[in-house]
A protein has these predicted regions:
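Conserved thiamine diphosphate
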Residues: 1-31, 171, 176-178
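Thiamine diphosphate
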Residues: 21, 30-183
Length: 183
């Protein structure tokens, strides 16, 4: 995934669900300027209530928010968007104010104007956690010096999916722990 993102002029999409996949496919087949890579999962994912076909064209957008005065941003892509929303709902139950941003394409988000980037990832909110089941290096530009990234920076493991996800910290409990440690 990091290798694909490093290729100049290649739009890489890692959609969160069927709705984002439809949008990514549409953008791929209608693109006249750049090739596209769709990175899909074999997981059986639910369609998130907040995913939006039209907003995929911006590369990143708010998929969940429980308060206008949020102080935490969870940034996720692909199947991890489901995890981020589940963690946000649990954090909400604990009194936290959280925004979840789905990032189906870092390439497309990175070329948006500064005003849109600020709307999605306001500089004033520095408590940020990015979540992706891949190398972490793509995410530090979004979480900044005060944030954290939950990812995989070692060679993969082989086991049933649930066991691997737990081993690498892709659980609601781990996301909450990382968020709480940022306070």
């Amino acid at each position: 995934l990091a290798g694909l993102r490093a290729i100049p002029n290649l739009n890489v999409f890692r959609p969160a669900d069927a709705r984002e996949t439809q949008a990514a496919w549409y953008l791929a087949v209608t693109s006249e300027k750049t090739p596209t890579a769709l990175v899909l999962t074999r997981q059986n994912l639910t369609v998130e209530e907040g995913t939006d076909f039209d907003k995929v064209a911006k590369g990143a957008y708010v998929v969940y928010e429980n308060a206008a005065d949020f102080d935490t941003i969870l940034i996720a892509t692909g199947s991890e968007v489901n995890l981020a929303v589940a963690a946000a709902k649990e954090l909400e139950a604990q009194g936290e104010k959280v925004r979840v941003v789905s990032v189906p394409s870092t390439d497309i988000f990175d070329v948006q104007d500064a005003a849109y980037k600020e709307e999605i990832l306001p500089n004033a909110v520095r408590r940020r956690v990015a979540i992706e089941m891949a190398a972490t290096q793509s995410w530090y530009k979004y979480v900044g010096l005060d944030g954290a990234v939950i990812g995989i920076d070692k060679f993969g493991a082989s086991a049933p999916a649930a066991k691997v996800m737990e081993e690498y910290g892709f659980t609601v409990a781990r996301v909450i722990e990382v968020v709480k440690n940022l306070k």
